[in-house]
C-alpha cells in the first residue's frame, strides 16, 4: 500500500475497509482519501490518481452495506471540531465538523445546556452523515434542528451553505441522498433551543423515565432513557456487526392500510409524515414472517430486534445482502408490502 501525504489530506492505495464499516465485512478501497482540513478538499480531489474516479464518502460506515469492493475512491472526513458559534436569548448555533461522532455531539449539546437532540442519542455515525438520511428516532428527526449544512458542491467546484429548506429534508431523505454525486458535507450548524418541549410520545421512553425516577424529566434524562433502551434492544456494533435498523418502516396510503388491517387485525399502524399516509412497523412484519432471531451461517437477525441484520463473524457483504433480500421477499409475499433498506448498498443492486 502506497501513501501520498499533503497538507490537510492523505491518499492511501489498496486500503482495507473492515474497520471502517459497522457490519465489519471485508472490502478494499482502491484509493482511500482522508481529509483533515476541508479547505484542502478541492486540491485533494484534483489528485491525478482519483480526479476522474467515482467517490464514496464513509463516515463511521454505520449506514452502508459493502456487498463488494467500492469502485474508485473512498473519502473519509477527519475534521472533528465542535463549537458554539452564536448565542441567543433562547437558543444557540452549534457547528460540528463532518468527522464528529454523532453521539458525542448529542452529549456536547446537553453539557452546554442545549436541548433538541436528546431523542437521537446513541445513533451510530458521524455528523456529516446525519443530514443525508435525516436521521430520526423516538419521534424526533435531526432536520428539525439543522440550521445550515456546509458542503462542497462538486458540480460548481465551490463551497456552499444550504439552509434546511434547501436540504429538502424528508423521511430518511434529503437533497444529499437524491444527488449523491453532487455534495460533500464538510460541517453542519444546528439551531438548538435552551428549553425545548420534550418528545415523550413513545411509551417506552415514558416507562424508562418512570423506572429511573425521573417523572419530571429534563433533556438529559430523556437522553439517558434513550441510551438505556438502545443498549438493551440494539447490539453494540463494536461487538456484533450491524448497521442498526436495516429496513425503513413502510409508508402506505391509508386505503391500503385499511385493507391490510381487514386481514391482519393486530397489525400496528402509526401516523405517517403526510396526510393520507400511515406507517407500518417493518419490525412487526419481519417478526410475523419468522425472521426474528434467525441465523444462517454468520448472517442473521438479532433475537432482540427484528429490524437489525447482524454479522456474527465472517459473513460477507454479499451474504448479508442475500439474507436481507429473502427477508424482504417473504414480507412482500405475505403482506404485499415492499420493504426498502435504510443502509446504502455498495457494490451491488438491491
From Swiss-Prot:
One of its GO terms (cellular component) is cytosol. It comes from the Bacteria. Pathway: Cell wall biogenesis; peptidoglycan biosynthesis. GO terms for biological process: cell division; cell wall organization; peptidoglycan biosynthetic process; regulation of cell shape. It holds the Pfam family FAD_binding_4. Signal peptide: none annotated. It catalyses: UDP-N-acetyl-alpha-D-muramate + NADP(+) = UDP-N-acetyl-3-O-(1-carboxyvinyl)-alpha-D-glucosamine + NADPH + H(+). It is found in: Cytoplasm. Belongs to the MurB family. It comes from Xanthomonas oryzae pv. oryzae (strain PXO99A). GO terms for molecular function: FAD binding; UDP-N-acetylmuramate dehydrogenase activity. This is UDP-N-acetylenolpyruvoylglucosamine reductase. The active site is at residues 172, 245, 342.
Amino acid at each position: 500500500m502506497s501513501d501520498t501525504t499533503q497538507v490537510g489530506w492523505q491518499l492511501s492505495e489498496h486500503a482495507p475497509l473492515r474497520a471502517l464499516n459497522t457490519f465489519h465485512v471485508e472490502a478494499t478501497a482502491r484509493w482511500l482519501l482522508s481529509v483533515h482540513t476541508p479547505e484542502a478538499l478541492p486540491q485533494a480531489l484534483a489528485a491525478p490518481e482519483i480526479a476522474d474516479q467515482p467517490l464514496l464518502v464513509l463516515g463511521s460506515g454505520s449506514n452502508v452495506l459493502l456487498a463488494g469492493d467500492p469502485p474508485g475512491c473512498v473519502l473519509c472526513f477527519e475534521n472533528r471540531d465542535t463549537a458554539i458559534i452564536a448565542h441567543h436569548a433562547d437558543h444557540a448555533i452549534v457547528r460540528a465538523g463532518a468527522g464528529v461522532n454523532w453521539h458525542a455531539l448529542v452529549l456536547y449539546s446537553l453539557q452546554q445546556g442545549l436541548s433538541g437532540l436528546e431523542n437521537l442519542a446513541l445513533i451510530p455515525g458521524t455528523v456529516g452523515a446525519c443530514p443525508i438520511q435525516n436521521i430520526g428516532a423516538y419521534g424526533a428527526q435531526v432536520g428539525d434542528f439543522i440550521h445550515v449544512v456546509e458542503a462542497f458542491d462538486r458540480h460548481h467546484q465551490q463551497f456552499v451553505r444550504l439552509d434546511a429548506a434547501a436540504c429538502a429534508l424528508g423521511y430518511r431523505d434529503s437533497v444529499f441522498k437524491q444527488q449523491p454525486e453532487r455534495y460533500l458535507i464538510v460541517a453542519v450548524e444546528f439551531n438548538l433551543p435552551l428549553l425545548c418541549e420534550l418528545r415523550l410520545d413513545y411509551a417506552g421512553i415514558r416507562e424508562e423515565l418512570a423506572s429511573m425516577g425521573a417523572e419530571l424529566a429534563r433533556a438529559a434524562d430523556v437522553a439517558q432513557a434513550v441510551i438505556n433502551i438502545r443498549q438493551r434492544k440494539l447490539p453494540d456494533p463494536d461487538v456484533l456487526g450491524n448497521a442498526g435498523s436495516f429496513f425503513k418502516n413502510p409508508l402506505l396510503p391509508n386505503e391500503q392500510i385499511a385493507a391490510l388491517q381487514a386481514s391482519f387485525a393486530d397489525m400496528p399502524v402509526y401516523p405517517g409524515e403526510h396526510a393520507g399516509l400511515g406507517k407500518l412497523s417493518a419490525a412487526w412484519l419481519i417478526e410475523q414472517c419468522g425472521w426474528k432471531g434467525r441465523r444462517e451461517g454468520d448472517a442473521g437477525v438479532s433475537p432482540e430486534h427484528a429490524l437489525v441484520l447482524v454479522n456474527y463473524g465472517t459473513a460477507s457483504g454479499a451474504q448479508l445482502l442475500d439474507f436481507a433480500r429473502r427477508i424482504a421477499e417473504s414480507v412482500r409475499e405475505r403482506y404485499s408490502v415492499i420493504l426498502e433498506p435504510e443502509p446504502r448498498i455498495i457494490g451491488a443492486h438491491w
